[in-house]
From Swiss-Prot:
Residues that, per the record, bind dUMP: R140, R141, R185, S186, N187, D188, N196, H226, I227, Y228
Homology family: Belongs to the thymidylate synthase family. Bacterial-type ThyA subfamily.
Protein encoded by which gene: thyA
Entry keyword set: Cytoplasm, Methyltransferase, Nucleotide biosynthesis, Transferase
Name of the protein this chain belongs to: Thymidylate synthase
Organism: Streptococcus thermophilus (strain ATCC BAA-250 / LMG 18311)
Lineage of the species this protein comes from: Bacteria, Bacillati, Bacillota, Bacilli, Lactobacillales
Length: 286
């Protein structure tokens, strides 16, 4: 059993046994009914990527390829355009969060509002982050924040769930490591937990490669970790499953010091990944 599997089962058990019910819930199911959930607060996990600990479960298949493509959409393309996400990456699940009548920051007609990639572009976040890491790798101000009140007032749209990332550099002997911390306001435990974690591990790996550093530790804090009320059967099924004996790890197959913007989704490879099947079905809360 991997560390991620252990944490996954512990979180499911804690939510089901100790979680409290949501009140005045915003999300809806596709039939229009309120998507209530049981939740816990203050969830934290630590993974040492340098030792092969990756935040991906083997208890069910995780769509890692499309998840990583979303990272490129946000941080390389730096757009909120659904057309780019579909035409360039063949990713469609953000369509449920389209904000009608709000054009994308690149002029395309369809967007998710002034969110995610649009905020990255607006503040030139990636270029600023890379520049200050270049100037002083040991500075303590390496923060990506997608929480933009001005953008929230400008258009409608889902407010970012994974909204803040921080990076720190450590020297251990002759090696330099990049650590990453992801802060998330809200997380759908069964559907999105490992998707979001692995997305930001991928981002951490891209930044580390840019400088020729090794990836170090990944810290993951979630304020509200929940399971929706139409997912309880799937939760029980996951608790019953025996994890695969594989040890999955994400590999970025480019040379050290490859420019951040030259890395491509196909440069990533998830190796030794043999998750338990069949896949479970989930009706998403929107």
């Amino acid at each position: 059993m991997t560390k991620a599997d252990t944490i996954f089962k512990e979180n499911i058990t804690k939510i089901m046994e100790e979680g409290v019910w949501s009140e005045q819930a915003r999300p809806k199911y596709k039939d229009g009914t309120t998507a209530n959930s049981k939740y816990i607060t203050g969830s934290f996990a630590e993974y040492d990527l340098s030792k092969g600990e990756f935040p991906i479960t083997t208890l069910r298949p995780i769509a890692i390829k499309s998840a990583i493509k979303e990272v490129f959409w946000i941080y390389q393309d730096q757009t909120n355009s659904l057309d780019v996400l579909e035409d360039k990456y063949n990713v469609h699940y953000w369509n449920d969060w389209e904000v009608e009548g709000v054009p994308a920051n690149n002029g395309d007609k369809r967007s998710i509002g002034q969110r995610y990639g649009a905020v990255v572009k607006k503040h030139d976040i990636i270029n600023r982050l890379l520049a200050q890491l270049e100037a002083n790798p040991w500075n303590r101000r390496n923060v990506i924040s997608l929480w933009d009140y001005e953008a929230f007032e400008e258009t409608a749209g889902l407010q970012p769930c994974a909204f803040q990332t921080m990076f720190d550099v450590r020297r251990v002997g002759e090696d330099v490591y990049l650590d990453g911390t992801l802060t998330q306001r809200s997380n759908d435990m069964l559907v999105a937990h490992h998707i979001n974690a692995m997305q930001y591990v991928a981002l951490q790996m891209m930044i580390a490669k840019h400088f020729g550093w090794k990836v170090g530790k990944f810290f993951y804090f979630i304020n509200n970790l929940h399971i929706y009320d139409n997912q309880f059967e799937q939760a029980e099924e996951l608790l019953k499953r025996q994890p695969s004996d594989c040890q999955p790890r994400l590999v970025l197959n480019v040379p050290d010091e490859t420019n951040f913007f030259d890395i491509k989704p196909e440069d990533f490879e998830l190796v030794d990944y043999d998750p338990v099947k069949p896949q479970l079905k989930f009706d998403l809360a929107i």
